[in-house]
């Protein structure tokens, strides 16, 4: 394999060999460092003097050995690890493995523990005059030095010979050269760095000389930056007090404020889950008064809060690399809740709220999700968001995990995340009594990994460049618009097919046109109960809002019945005692009264449609519709309803058809010519007369 070459790079006027990634970060984020140092990289802030707190070893390693870095950056970072001492030796060894995967080898890796070979390499290096040899020579001298003063003297060679004042100053800060003997010399190196910044990045010089802008931080924001176990009760009490104040006023502004405060409480819940302190979420819920809890977690969400917390905590910890064991979902009640459609949907709604709370800026200033964590805040937010999105997938595609649509929704996961989840769930399944659901999840992840991404699948892009900034505000735009708008084409398309096919209009939401609901067979089944809704509960646009005052009935079916009600005059057959003057005769010729049916059947058609009441009634031959007794039909939209249990017929558009089976359905009506009743082959005796047009 090819040995590494030590080369000096210049990034916007900043020359460096040991810290090219840091130099690139400073050059790309000078405004952020000046205006919002709290959200900047901690190593950068420490080097520029914005903070006196030395970053942790992990934070230093993230900058000198970044993920997906080039072989050049990786080799330079390995040299820094050797200078920083034994604490960074494991980082050096892991860097050597990564470098070999890139087809290169570090020249010191195989001989670092062999003093004889190191001494021989140092002698050979003195004979070379390249910058590569000069840097290696200084590096070997620093590694052989014992005292801090001696180390600094050797490092200062980089400043005089190679103009690497920036590297010398950073190493001096990290090694803690703060003795009085070295203070004056370090100040000279610092002045050299600020002079270089003046020509290329004047804002960085201003920061090093004047220090960072110190904005006044309100006590509540300061409280949120302290460890959660110390601040949780005070933070919840503060939010609840503001929530109750807003509840005293019923206007749009107070509703918006209450929504924001509710998400602040949910943010605290998600923070506890990301921090591995799941019990803190229960504390947060218990500190909320019942009235506040009912608004933040309405309805069934309050009942499934525990299950949502356990599911979210499980997946978040997997994404954050936790190796601890997890509780059986059946034991904590999560498995049972997932089996219920409505409880599962309530869990999904909570998971969506969890995601919004970390993606949106719920507070007046950006608050890191885990202030005390050594991990980059943006990395934490990305992992938590992906974890919650996968937990949401579990709830939304429960029972259909292996379907194509479900697999396409997993494209947001990277191959590394899928493998991590598969390994974790396989270990998790070993201790379960019922493994069906978990096995379905594993199978879906494996299928998604092996299949090619769909062209319509959701695509995500990530940037591993050096311009990464640790701010939640920059992550807000990632999922701001979770719903897409579906445009239905209107030219060159079969609109009937488009309208009747299901369309995806949002996450797990589809819509399709359907035929209108047919008229009910029994009019008596219609519920004509008057509405009792108060004006405060329902508004004219159908939304629950205190700013509207027009009432709507609670049952839309009532409105439909009112709209469908026929406005034509209804003619009711006279009672037997009133029919003495009919065509049957008069006086003693009155026929024996027939039983009056209970139901009155309402029909409607193209023309006026009277109610057919009783077993028979005569209509004129030129009327708008024919009435049949034993199954007669009529012209118009619908046939008459047949007696003796008959159902109603259908409207025709051409010639009228003959009524059929008086015990089953009435005859088919017509638009131009009425139909006649038919029963036992006798037409017109008890049947209806011919209808008109």
UniProtKB/Swiss-Prot annotation:
Effect of residue 682 to A: Reduces methylation of the RNA-binding RGG-box. Abolishes methylation of the RNA-binding RGG-box
Superkingdom as given in the UniProt entry: Eukaryota
Annotated stretches, region: Disordered: 445-468, 523-591, 620-693
Catalysis: reaction(s): [RNA] containing guanosine + H2O = an [RNA fragment]-3'-guanosine-3'-phosphate + a 5'-hydroxy-ribonucleotide-3'-[RNA fragment]
Compositional bias per record (Low complexity), positions renumbered to this chain: 447-468
Residue ranges, annotated region (Required for interaction with sepa-1): 581-614
Chain spans, region RNA-binding RGG-box: 633-693
Result for mutant: residue 634 to L: Abolishes RNA-binding
Effect upon mutating residue 690 to G: Abolishes RNA-binding
Outcome recorded upon mutating residue 661 to A: Reduces methylation of the RNA-binding RGG-box. Abolishes methylation of the RNA-binding RGG-box
Post-translation changes: Methylated at arginine residues in the RNA-binding RGG-box by prmt-1. Methylation promotes P-granule degradation by autophagy.
Tissue spec. comment: Highly expressed in the germline. Expressed in most somatic cells.
Catalytic site: 437
Alphabetic keyword roster: Developmental protein, Endonuclease, Hydrolase, Lyase, Methylation, Nuclease, RNA-binding
Segments of skewed composition (Gly residues): 625-634, 641-660, 668-693
Segments of this protein annotated with the region Involved in dimerization: 205-447
EC identifiers of the protein: 4.6.1.24
GO molecular function: identical protein binding; lyase activity; ribonuclease T1 activity; RNA binding; RNA endonuclease activity
Consequence when changing residue 668 to A: Reduces methylation of the RNA-binding RGG-box. Abolishes methylation of the RNA-binding RGG-box
GO cellular component, one term: P granule
Main localisation: cytoplasm
Subcellular location field: Cytoplasmic granule
UniProt domain comment: The dimerization domain also acts as a hinge; changes in its structure probably impact oligomerization and RNA-binding.
Assembly information from the UniProt record: May form a homodimer. Interacts with pgl-1 and pgl-2; this association is not required for P-granule localization of either pgl-1 or pgl-2. Interacts with sepa-1; the interaction is enhanced in the presence of RNA. Interacts with prmt-1; the interaction is direct.
Function text: Guanyl-specific endoribonuclease which cleaves the phosphodiester bond in single-stranded RNA between the 3'-guanylic residue and the 5'-OH residue of adjacent nucleotide, resulting in the formation of a corresponding 2',3'-cyclic phosphate intermediate. P-granule component involved in germline development. Together with the P-granule component pgl-1, is involved in the formation of P-granules. Together with pgl-1, probably recruits other granule components such as pos-1, mex-3 and glh-1, and RNA to P-granules.
Name of the protein this chain belongs to: Guanyl-specific ribonuclease pgl-3
């Amino acid at each position: 394999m090819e040995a590494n070459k030590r080369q000096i790079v210049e990034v916007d006027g900043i020359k460096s060999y040991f810290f090219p990634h840091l130099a690139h970060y400073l050059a790309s984020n000078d405004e952020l460092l000046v205006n919002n140092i709290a959200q900047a990289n901690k190593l950068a802030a420490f080097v520029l003097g914005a903070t006196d707190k030395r970053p942790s070893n992990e934070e230093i390693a993230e900058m000198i050995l970044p993920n997906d870095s080039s072989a050049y950056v990786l080799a330079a970072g390995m040299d820094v690890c050797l200078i920083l001492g034994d604490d960074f030796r494991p980082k050096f060894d892991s860097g050597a493995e990564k470098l070999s995967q890139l087809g290169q080898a570090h020249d010191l890796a195989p001989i670092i523990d062999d003093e004889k070979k190191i001494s021989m390499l140092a002698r050979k290096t003195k004979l070379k005059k390249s910058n590569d040899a000069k840097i290696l020579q200084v590096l070997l001298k620093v590694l052989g030095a014992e005292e801090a003063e001696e180390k600094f003297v050797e490092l200062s060679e980089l400043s005089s010979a190679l103009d690497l004042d920036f590297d010398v100053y950073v190493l001096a800060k990290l090694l803690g050269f703060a003795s009085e003997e070295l203070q004056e010399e370090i100040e000279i190196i610092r002045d050299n760095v600020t002079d270089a910044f003046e020509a290329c990045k004047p804002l960085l010089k201003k920061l090093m000389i004047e220090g960072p802008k110190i904005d006044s931080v309100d006590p509540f924001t300061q409280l949120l930056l302290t460890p959660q176990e110390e601040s949780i009760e005070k933070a919840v009490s503060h939010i609840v007090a503001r929530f109750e104040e807003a509840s005293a006023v019923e206007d749009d502004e107070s509703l918006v404020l209450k929504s924001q405060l509710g998400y602040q409480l949910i943010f605290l819940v998600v923070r506890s889950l990301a921090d591995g302190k799941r019990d803190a979420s229960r504390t947060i819920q218990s500190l909320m008064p019942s009235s506040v809890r009912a608004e933040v977690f309405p309805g069934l969400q309050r009942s499934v809060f525990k299950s949502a917390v356990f599911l979210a905590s499980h997946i978040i910890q997997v994404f954050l690399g936790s190796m601890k064991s997890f509780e059986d979902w059946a034991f904590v009640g999560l498995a049972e809740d997932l089996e219920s459609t409505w409880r599962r949907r309530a869990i999904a709604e909570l998971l969506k709220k969890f995601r919004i709370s970390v993606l949106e800026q719920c507070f007046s200033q950006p608050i890191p999700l885990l202030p005390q964590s050594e991990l980059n805040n943006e990395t934490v937010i990305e992992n938590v968001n992906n974890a919650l999105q996968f937990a949401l997938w579990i709830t939304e595609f429960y029972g259909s995990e292996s379907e194509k649509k479900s697999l396409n929704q997993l494209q947001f996961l990277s191959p590394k995340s899928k493998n991590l989840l598969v390994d974790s769930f396989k270990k998790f399944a070993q201790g379960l009594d019922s493994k069906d659901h978990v096995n379905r999840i594993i199978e879906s992840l494996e299928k998604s990994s092996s299949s090619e991404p769909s062209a319509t699948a959701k695509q995500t892009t990530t940037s591993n460049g050096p311009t990464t900034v640790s701010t939640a505000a920059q992550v807000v735009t990632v999922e701001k618009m979770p719903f897409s708008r579906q445009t239905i084409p209107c030219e060159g398309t079969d609109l009937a097919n488009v309208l009747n096919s299901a369309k995806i209009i949002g996450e797990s939401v589809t819509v399709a046109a359907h035929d209108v609901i047919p008229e009910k067979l029994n009019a008596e089944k219609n519920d004509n109960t008057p509405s009792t809704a108060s004006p405060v509960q329902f508004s004219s646009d159908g939304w629950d809002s205190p700013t509207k005052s027009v009432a709507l009935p609670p049952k839309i079916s009532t409105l439909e019945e009112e709209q469908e009600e026929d406005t034509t005059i209804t003619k009711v057959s006279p009672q037997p005692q009133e029919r003495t003057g009919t065509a049957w005769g008069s006086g003693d010729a009155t026929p024996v009264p027939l039983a009056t049916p209970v139901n009155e059947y309402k029909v409607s058609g193209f023309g006026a449609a009277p109610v057919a009441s009783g077993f028979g009634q005569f209509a004129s031959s030129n009327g708008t519709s024919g009435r049949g007794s034993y199954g007669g039909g009529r012209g118009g939209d619908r046939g008459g309803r047949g007696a003796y249990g008959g159902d109603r017929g259908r409207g025709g558009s051409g010639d009228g058809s003959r009524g059929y089976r008086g015990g089953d359905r009435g005859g088919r009506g017509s638009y131009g010519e009425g139909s006649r009743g038919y029963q036992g082959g006798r037409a017109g005796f008890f049947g209806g007369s011919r209808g008109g047009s």
